[in-house]
Curated annotation (Swiss-Prot):
<dbReference type="InterPro" id="IPR000276">
    <property type="entry name" value="GPCR_Rhodpsn"/>
</dbReference>
<feature type="transmembrane region" description="Helical; Name=3">
    <location>
        <begin position="116"/>
        <end position="137"/>
    </location>
</feature>
<feature type="disulfide bond">
    <location>
        <begin position="114"/>
        <end position="195"/>
    </location>
</feature>
<dbReference type="GO" id="GO:0007186">
    <property type="term" value="P:G protein-coupled receptor signaling pathway"/>
</dbReference>
<dbReference type="GO" id="GO:0016520">
    <property type="term" value="F:growth hormone-releasing hormone receptor activity"/>
</dbReference>
<feature type="topological domain" description="Cytoplasmic">
    <location>
        <begin position="138"/>
        <end position="164"/>
    </location>
</feature>
<feature type="transmembrane region" description="Helical; Name=4">
    <location>
        <begin position="165"/>
        <end position="184"/>
    </location>
</feature>
<keyword id="KW-0807">Transducer</keyword>
<keyword id="KW-0812">Transmembrane</keyword>
<keyword id="KW-1133">Transmembrane helix</keyword>
<protein>
    <recommendedName>
        <fullName>Gonadotropin-releasing hormone receptor</fullName>
    </recommendedName>
</protein>
<comment type="function">
    <text>Receptor for gonadotropin releasing hormone (GnRH) that mediates the action of GnRH to stimulate the secretion of the gonadotropic hormones luteinizing hormone (LH) and follicle-stimulating hormone (FSH). This receptor mediates its action by association with G-proteins that activate a phosphatidylinositol-calcium second messenger system.</text>
</comment>
<feature type="topological domain" description="Extracellular">
    <location>
        <begin position="300"/>
        <end position="305"/>
    </location>
</feature>
<feature type="transmembrane region" description="Helical; Name=1">
    <location>
        <begin position="39"/>
        <end position="58"/>
    </location>
</feature>
<feature type="topological domain" description="Cytoplasmic">
    <location>
        <begin position="232"/>
        <end position="280"/>
    </location>
</feature>
<feature type="transmembrane region" description="Helical; Name=6">
    <location>
        <begin position="281"/>
        <end position="299"/>
    </location>
</feature>
<feature type="transmembrane region" description="Helical; Name=7">
    <location>
        <begin position="306"/>
        <end position="325"/>
    </location>
</feature>
Amino acid sequence: MANNASLEQDQNHCSAINNSIPLTQGKLPTLTLSGKIRVTVTFFLFLLSTAFNASFLVKLQRWTQKRKKGKKLSRMKVLLKHLTLANLLETLIVMPLDGMWNITVQWYAGEFLCKVLSYLKLFSMYAPAFMMVVISLDRSLAVTQPLAVQSKSKLERSMTSLAWILSIVFAGPQLYIFRMIYLADGSGPAVFSQCVTHCSFPQWWHEAFYNFFTFSCLFIIPLLIMLICNAKIIFALTRVLHQDPRKLQLNQSKNNIPRARLRTLKMTVAFGTSFVICWTPYYVLGIWYWFDPEMLNRVSEPVNHFFFLFAFLNPCFDPLIYGYFSL
């Protein structure tokens, strides 16, 4: 939340005993009109994303039950199921937390939930990003090395398991760095409480390194992998078509154009496009703040809220994309 980040950055003193910070500025964050609009949009997207992702899971389950007994789901549908679960997890954790936090402005839930919910928030953001990587890698291997993929039946299970495990592990530091701080004006009890990372890093570069690590894992690395995988798929298809269009038998069909594989290629490209459109504004704002914290005072509050809301569109778009292309 932008106003909380500003509050944390503005203070330069903390007590090692009780994390109490003297209130040197009379202005505390409040719920403004633009904040109310952000909350309204957040809960609308929450309902939309929950409905879309839950509907796709139900549809996938019904489709599975109609299949012949003993016949397993295709690799792609198994991966889509994991991505849907990850998106639903992000929807159920991140959006309500953001909406309620913007309503209350300060943190009332205590230090335990401060740590746990901060951990769950980052975990639920890692999971869909890593699942996007798994889908991109799987589609790339399916086109460039189809025989190798078919012979390694456990590869898909290993990649999805690794994605979940990395999400759990990489979010771990949140349990340590997030803590409660209390602002006081010197006249009595604390007048404002917040859940932040204030005084959690011994040196400034420790925090910079951690922020860059999370930024890389959530955005840069997944984006690069998706771009490389899509480029390899397009290059492989183009090369085979140029050699002999009749040799392009990627769907195990002898005479037909591989429509299923081309459809999954379009779907992975659509995933990547949605990922870039939804997350780029969010991370551009975050990087700008890292290098220039005062930018929050120069950029209007409605613009800040607008950029942050872009990230909530991704779990809404994904079920529309794979619902359109896969079923």
